């Protein structure tokens, strides 16, 4: 995953504009781009950088069929690319999450404890919170993964509508906008 991703981006902070071409240079097997992917522009860019396709996490959460609480979908729709935070860095288990009161508590603990922090110190904000958030809609229960791509999510289509739109956008980009570069 590129640094933009929701969830665990690794510890080296490498965005997809660097990571994907490096992967294309180094790998001898097909790979998909992941992190910051939302639309036809993402797909065309991923293909141009050597990926065979793209993986979308945060974007697919905001679809009609996604089996998560409506509060999660609405929180992502209301968010911008500036509303995520990186947590658990001192533990070298960095996770990108959507800001909420539980995340603010976690960040306060990280700031106060610094390098002395232990998982047990933040367990209330991370351990077992996913069912509370994703199933019950308790948006302040703690940290939950969300990518910076939230800033590019404006609607809640069906999966079919989303995939069709992505393919149509990619086709238009390639056949109209990019044709003049050849």
Give, region by region, the residue ranges found by the protein language model:
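Conserved active-site-proximal phosphate/metal-binding subdomains
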Residues: 5-32, 38-182
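Non-cysteine beta-strand/loop elements that form the S-adenosyl-L-methionine
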Residues: 1-2
